[in-house]
């Protein structure tokens, strides 16, 4: 029985040929179908979609064949971003959904993201290990009645849902640069543009790298990397736009640029979105991760909301949101989660909400909004250290700082707070890395000093 190394902690990702091919995709379909059928033998339906990668369509069809051979009905919604699968799964009330995507991974990779009913995530401890075991064993139960297959477009319904997050009459005239990175976002932007015209929403869109093209002629879209930001930034400056928006390949993350073309750290976007929601629903709960938190806590508290800290990672955030009935959850990594979107992440909802937030304060630019937050709570951004013994170093760092700290949390790694500054240090689930985030209160020099101090200590301990 050969191990399938494409199964990761939270999803499926692998190099084409050696780790993932059509035959393995078929087995994953059979396995997921058998996994669903093991709960009860009622009719089951799964939604499938795929991004623009050149191999996604063939993998999706193999996956669909596996599902149907397991007795599962398949609804194929075509070329999609991951969030379109999330939407289709909860909107149609079906039993699960699978998106074929490798997001921002290299060209020779592909993968899958799986959810079950209500778009609840399937990851290591919620079914993915069982599906992996079935796929590796490759011995499937006989099925008397195969599932059926149909193609459906839900784009109009999905765009209706996106528009529901804003009040069209409140939107002021604005010029937006949108860089789809030749990924799956293009068709959604086109449909949104039509809807803006129909509803007299005065948003002008300048499109960059718009055509969906699995060859990715302008490089793999991953705006988290500084080298992937120039085209968006330059277009914002050239067209004198009010905001720039850039997506990764399956557009589950969006990255924002102010009117000067400057990239905005995801941390500060969490605060903006929290404020936008608390203007709509006073007293709501907002979930945030512990890596950087002071700005979010400050905004939420001042806006009359309740900040709730959760461990980093989509499965943890979604679970905590459901438990708390939180309206919104945000991570500094540009993942934003919404209660009314099945507690799932969306890359489209954030920028729509921020256009409304800017419209409600028409004399304040995006750069002014963000610079005020950067001044109050300057942050380092995430700094990665490749180390030999991550957990041992974390323990030593904790012992070094704990005595002088005023607050400690182990929700995710170690978070220690002091007068005027704090840090979070956590190890990666998948790589031999330590990830450091430092922030301060109105003191950039202190923040930089502490980054240097912690960097020296971590390197000294890595022996």
From Swiss-Prot:
Q: Which domain of life is it from?
A: Bacteria
* Reactions accelerated catalytically: alpha-D-mannose 1-phosphate = D-mannose 6-phosphate
Look up the EC number in the record and give it.
5.4.2.8
Q: Which PROSITE patterns match?
A: PGM_PMM (PS00710)
Q: What class of enzyme is it?
A: isomerase
Alphabetically, the GO molecular function entries are: magnesium ion binding; phosphomannomutase activity
Q: Where in the cell is it found?
A: Cell membrane
> Which amino acids does the record list as binding Mg(2+)?
103, 248, 250, 252
User: What CDD domains is this protein classified in?
Assistant: PMM_PGM
Question: What cofactor does this chain's UniProt record say it requires?
Answer: Mg(2+)
Q: In which pathway does it act?
A: Nucleotide-sugar biosynthesis; GDP-alpha-D-mannose biosynthesis; alpha-D-mannose 1-phosphate from D-fructose 6-phosphate: step 2/2; Bacterial outer membrane biogenesis; LPS O-antigen biosynthesis
> A GO CC term?
plasma membrane
Keywords, ordered alphabetically: Cell membrane, Isomerase, Lipopolysaccharide biosynthesis, Magnesium, Membrane, Metal-binding, Phosphoprotein
Q: Name one Pfam family in it.
A: PGM_PMM_III
Q: Which GO terms describe its biological process?
A: GDP-mannose biosynthetic process; O antigen biosynthetic process
What family is reported? Belongs to the phosphohexose mutase family.
- Protein's job: Involved in GDP-mannose biosynthesis which serves as the activated sugar nucleotide precursor for mannose residues in cell surface polysaccharides.
Listed name of the protein: Phosphomannomutase
Name its species.
Vibrio cholerae serotype O1 (strain ATCC 39315 / El Tor Inaba N16961)
Query: Which gene name belongs to this protein?
Result: rfbB
């Amino acid at each position: 029985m050969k191990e399938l190394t494409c199964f990761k902690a939270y999803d499926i990702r692998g190099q084409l040929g050696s780790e993932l091919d059509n035959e393995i995709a078929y087995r994953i379909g059979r396995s997921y179908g058998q996994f669903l059928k093991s709960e009860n033998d009622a009719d089951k339906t799964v939604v499938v979609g795929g991004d623009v990668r050149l191999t996604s369509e063939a993998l999706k069809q193999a996956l669909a064949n596996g599902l149907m051979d397991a007795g599962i009905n398949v609804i194929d919604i075509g070329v999609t971003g991951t969030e379109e699968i999330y939407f289709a799964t909860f909107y149609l009330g079906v039993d699960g959904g699978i998106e074929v995507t490798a997001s921002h991974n290299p060209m020779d990779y592909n993968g899958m993201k799986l959810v079950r009913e209500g778009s609840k995530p399937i990851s290591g401890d919620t079914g993915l290990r069982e599906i992996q075991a079935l796929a590796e064993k490759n011995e499937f139960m006989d099925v008397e009645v195969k599932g059926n297959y149909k193609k459906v477009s839900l784009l109009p319904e999905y765009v209706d849902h996106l528009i529901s997050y804003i009040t069209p009459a409140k939107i002021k005239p604005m010029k937006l640069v949108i860089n789809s990175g030749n990924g799956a976002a293009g068709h959604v932007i086109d449909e949104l543009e039509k809807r803006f015209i129909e509803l007299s929403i005065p948003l002008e869109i300048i499109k960059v790298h718009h055509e969906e093209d699995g060859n990715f002629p302008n490089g793999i879209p991953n705006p988290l990397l500084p080298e992937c930001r120039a085209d968006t930034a330059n277009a914002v400056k050239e067209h004198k736009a009010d905001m720039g928006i850039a997506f990764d390949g399956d557009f589950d993350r969006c990255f924002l640029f102010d009117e000067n073309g400057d990239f905005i750290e995801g941390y500060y976007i969490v605060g903006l979105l929290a404020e936008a929601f608390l203007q709509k629903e006073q007293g709501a709960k907002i979930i945030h991760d512990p890596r950087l938190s002071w700005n979010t806590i400050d905004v939420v508290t001042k806006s009359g909301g309740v900040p709730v800290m959760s461990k980093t990672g989509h499965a943890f955030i979604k679970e905590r949101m459901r438990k708390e009935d939180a309206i919104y959850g945000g991570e500094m990594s540009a993942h934003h989660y919404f209660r009314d979107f099945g507690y799932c992440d969306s890359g489209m909802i954030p920028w729509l909400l921020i256009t409304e937030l800017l419209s409600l304060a028409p004399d304040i630019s995006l750069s002014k909004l963000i610079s005020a937050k950067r001044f109050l709570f300057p942050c380092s951004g995430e700094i990665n250290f490749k180390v030999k013994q991550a957990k041992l170093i974390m323990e030593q760092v904790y012992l070094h700082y704990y005595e002088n700290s005023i607050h400690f949390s182990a929700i995710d790694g170690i978070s220690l707070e002091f007068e005027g500054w704090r840090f979070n240090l956590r190890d990666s689930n998948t790589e031999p890395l330590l990830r450091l985030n430092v922030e301060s209160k109105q003191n950039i020099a202190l923040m930089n000093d502490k980054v240097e101090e912690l960097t020296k200590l971590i390197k000294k301990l890595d022996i």
